[in-house]
UniProtKB/Swiss-Prot annotation:
Name of this protein: Acetyl-coenzyme A carboxylase carboxyl transferase subunit beta
One annotated Gene Ontology cellular component of this protein: acetate CoA-transferase complex
Residues annotated as signal peptide: none
SUPFAM superfamilies xref list: ClpP/crotonase
Complexes and interactors: Acetyl-CoA carboxylase is a heterohexamer composed of biotin carboxyl carrier protein (AccB), biotin carboxylase (AccC) and two subunits each of ACCase subunit alpha (AccA) and ACCase subunit beta (AccD).
Gene that encodes the chain: accD
Database matches in Pfam families: Carboxyl_trans, Zn_ribbon_ACC
Source organism superkingdom: Bacteria
An individual GO BP term: fatty acid biosynthetic process
Length: 297
């Protein structure tokens, strides 16, 4: 073996391999919209919103609750509930195996997390869908956790906010999943009768049985920028009606323009703007008014 190969080439290759392995995995993230390569710690500061094109990336349910609620005084509702394969359903794979896989992947028992806490000092209860868990599909446990959150709002007379991100009813639970549409709609009717505010925040994507029930029943319906919202997907609709759909069809901006939702709020503005809105809806001081009153006192 030549001296050049031993002294120069091999050490150079080894240094290159060491350098590659020293870069932590997940340190960089490519924006799916503009394809900008973003430094992960900087992206976290913008709440997973691309600083180049303002694309709102999908985030997990716990991350969403973490950036929305105050840090202190949180309590999870229905955390002990776990899904059961009552129908022994099987398509290409057993439902119980799909559940096990989703639980390992996400660290969650099912696709909805409900939590009580405060929003800028205001008592509140929040539910958030975990889209990574079987597409955020709604089955019996998702429905029950949502109902428990709504019952908490009824008992404590505090507002409720739900962040939806779902493909719809869970196919593997058949009629049990469809029943959750009626179950969640019924408890929201009770909130409305009692005059307790419910704000629905639609994030990318919201489809199927979730969009046909709880997601569109808010006293105020908010969309994140460019979120996909609908019942069936655009391609399915185009194939059915045999027509080309308008530009931006089913995006939150299109729905706002046509009166289907009330507001579009960027992720970084959700916390202060919903706090002000809920304060007005409940007759409480806004966070700004509370600070002014405390300063005067």
């Amino acid at each position: 073996m030549s001296n050049w190969l031993v002294d120069k080439l091999i050490p150079s290759i080894m240094r290159s391999e060491v350098k590659k392995s020293s870069v932590p995995e997940g340190l960089w993230h490519k924006c799916p919209s503009c394809e900008a390569v973003l430094y992960r710690p900087e992206l976290e500061k913008t709440l997973d919103v691309c600083p180049k094109c303002n694309h709102h990336m999908r985030i997990g349910a716990r991350a969403r609750i973490d950036i929305f609620l105050d840090a202190e005084g949180r309590a999870e509702l229905g955390a002990d509930l776990e899904p059961v394969d009552r129908l022994k359903f099987r398509d290409g794979k057993k439902y119980k195996d799909r559940l096990t896989g989703a639980q390992k992947q996400t660290g969650e028992k099912d696709a909805l997390i409900s939590m009580s806490g405060t929003l800028m000092g205001m008592p509140i209860v929040v539910s958030a869908f975990e889209f990574s868990f079987m597409g955020g599909s709604m089955g019996a446990i998702v429905g029950e956790r949502f109902v428990r959150a709504a019952n908490y709002a009824l008992e404590h007379r505090c507002p409720m906010v739900c962040f939806s991100a779902s493909g719809g009813a869970r196919m593997q639970e058949a009629l049990i999943s469809l029943m959750q549409m009626a179950k969640t709609s019924a408890v929201l009717a009770r909130l409305r009768e009692e005059g307790i505010p419910f704000i629905s925040v639609l994030t990318d994507p919201v489809y199927g049985g979730v969009s046909a029930s709880l997601a569109m029943l808010g006293d105020v319906i908010v969309g994140e920028p460019k979120a996909l919202i609908g019942f069936a997907g655009p391609r399915v609709i185009e194939q059915t009606v045999r027509e080309k759909l308008p530009e931006g069809f089913q995006r939150s901006e299109f729905l706002l323009e046509h009166g289907a939702i009330d507001l579009i709020i960027s992720r970084g503005e959700l916390r202060p703007r919903l706090a002000r809105l809920l304060a007005q809806m409940t007759g409480q001081d806004t966070p700004e008014q509370a600070r002014e009153a405390a300063a005067v006192a």
